């Protein structure tokens, strides 16, 4: 049986694409194991059916003083932990999908001479993948032009969940839809306080509340507060701290208001739905803005910077979209044209080149 070690952790933006690949690999009877970080989100999200190995590592950026001095020692420890796991499992190939774990995992792959493939989800590559790109056999990218083109660079798209790829086309879902404008609000897996606050401010002053329905993912921190506030402003709203049924949520929505993480952008393209992006302003290298531009330039999305965001901006867009369903449909169709539904298979095709090659 062929063996693959997947390296991914930290955030849903790394874990969910890796899970999409892992599930398809398991369908193909590949032995898949997972390398993550102790205390990371992967401990909650990776199913028990995938053996999960955990090492100890934290982010390098932003460390000062003693913490900064200790980072080299901690990196060496993490590389050694990953090295032992790789030597024990003996994978045919290692697939790095990002997160803090990718650095030590990728270095351990190089030390053990195990073929390494990396996948960069964002439009601007992170520091870890820029380093690992020199060691990797192939560099897979979710967006075109993330890395300079050479023989190792392949644009696969970002893997998304199968249930999203299989959703009906925008024309089927939206063409005959009537009733309130359905707004899906997402702040990423952890929620986004600024989006939560601006949404409430915009909707509390919206003149015709019957025109709006909301499904709002708040994150755990703001859940109870946001739920109570919707009750006060008399807007039809479903409030969740985390939405697990994303196919149901996207299928329900006419419009998505969200951050611009790579996974969210590619899910929106895969489904085909109009969006307003509010990129996280502190993202490394401003990569969320560049992710969002991928859809905005195609006429599929609106970008509003958080620095200039006012509740009147959101209210104005909501009023326009409530009166112009045709524009929503056009934006949704433009998004769908950019989808790469075969992304999972493209990633796996590169992994197959190293099956039983050792």
UniProtKB/Swiss-Prot annotation:
Q: In which pathway does it act?
A: Cell wall biogenesis; peptidoglycan biosynthesis
Q: Show the catalytic activity.
A: di-trans,octa-cis-undecaprenyl diphospho-N-acetyl-alpha-D-muramoyl-L-alanyl-D-glutamyl-meso-2,6-diaminopimeloyl-D-alanyl-D-alanine + UDP-N-acetyl-alpha-D-glucosamine = di-trans,octa-cis-undecaprenyl diphospho-[N-acetyl-alpha-D-glucosaminyl-(1->4)]-N-acetyl-alpha-D-muramoyl-L-alanyl-D-glutamyl-meso-2,6-diaminopimeloyl-D-alanyl-D-alanine + UDP + H(+)
* Assigned GO CC terms: plasma membrane
The entry marks the following residues as binding UDP-N-acetyl-alpha-D-glucosamine, namely 11-13, 122, 161, 189, 243, 262-267, 288
Specify whether Nucleus is a keyword of the entry.
no
Q: Which keywords does UniProt give here?
A: Cell cycle, Cell division, Cell inner membrane, Cell membrane, Cell shape, Cell wall biogenesis/degradation, Glycosyltransferase, Membrane, Peptidoglycan synthesis, Transferase
Q: Where in the cell is it found?
A: Cell inner membrane
A single GO BP? cell division
Q: Which domain of life is it from?
A: Bacteria
**GO terms assigned for molecular function:** UDP-N-acetyl-D-glucosamine:N-acetylmuramoyl-L-alanyl-D-glutamyl-meso-2,6-diaminopimelyl-D-alanyl-D-alanine-diphosphoundecaprenol 4-beta-N-acetylglucosaminlytransferase activity; undecaprenyldiphospho-muramoylpentapeptide beta-N-acetylglucosaminyltransferase activity
Where is it mainly found?
membrane
- The record's EC number reads 2.4.1.227
Tell whether Lipid biosynthesis is among the UniProt keywords: no
Task: Name the PANTHER family on file.
Answer: GLYCOSYLTRANSFERASE (PTHR21015:SF22), UDP-N-ACETYLGLUCOSAMINE--N-ACETYLMURAMYL-(PENTAPEPTIDE) PYROPHOSPHORYL-UNDECAPRENOL N-ACETYLGLUCOSAMINE TRANSFERASE 1 (PTHR21015)
Query: What is the protein's name according to its record?
Result: UDP-N-acetylglucosamine--N-acetylmuramyl-(pentapeptide) pyrophosphoryl-undecaprenol N-acetylglucosamine transferase
């Amino acid at each position: 049986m062929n063996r693959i070690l997947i390296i991914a952790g930290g955030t849903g933006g790394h874990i969910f694409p890796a899970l999409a690949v892992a599930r398809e690999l398991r369908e193909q009877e590949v032995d898949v194991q997972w390398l993550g970080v102790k205390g990371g989100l992967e401990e909650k999200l990776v199913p028990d059916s995938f053996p999960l190995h955990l090492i100890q590592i934290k982010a390098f950026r932003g460390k000062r003083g003693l913490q900064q001095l200790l980072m080299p020692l901690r990196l060496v420890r993490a590389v050694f932990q990953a090295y032992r796991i790789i030597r024990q499992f003996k994978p045919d190939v290692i697939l790095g999908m990002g997160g803090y774990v990718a650095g030590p995992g990728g270095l351990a792959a190089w030390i053990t001479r195990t073929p390494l493939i990396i996948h960069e989800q964002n439009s601007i590559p992170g520091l870890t993948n820029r380093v690992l790109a020199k060691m990797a056999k192939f560099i897979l990218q979710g967006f075109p032009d993330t890395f300079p083109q050479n023989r190792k660079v392949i644009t696969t798209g970002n893997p998304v969940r199968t249930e999203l790829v299989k959703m009906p086309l925008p024309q089927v879902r939206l063409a005959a839809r009537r009733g309130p404008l359905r707004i899906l609000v997402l702040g990423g897996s952890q929620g986004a306080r600024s989006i939560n606050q601006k949404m409430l401010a915009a909707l509390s002053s919206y003149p015709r509340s019957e025109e709006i329905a909301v499904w709002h993912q708040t994150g755990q921190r703001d859940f109870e507060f946001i739920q109570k506030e919707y009750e006060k402003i008399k807007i039809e709203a479903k409030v969740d701290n985390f939405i697990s049924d994303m196919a149901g949520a996207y299928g329900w929505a006419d419009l998505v208001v969200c951050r611009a993480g790579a996974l969210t952008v590619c899910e929106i393209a895969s489904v085909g739905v109009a969006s307003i992006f509010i990129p996280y302003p502190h993202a490394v290298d401003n990569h969320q803005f560049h992710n969002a531009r991928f859809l905005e330039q195609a006429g599929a999305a609106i970008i509003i910077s958080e620095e200039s965001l006012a509740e009147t901006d959101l209210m104005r867009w909501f009023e326009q979209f409530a009166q112009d369903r045709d524009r929503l449909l056009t934006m949704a169709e433009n998004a769908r044209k950019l989808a790469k539904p075969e992304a999972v298979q493209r990633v796996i095709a590169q992994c197959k080149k190293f099956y039983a090659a050792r």
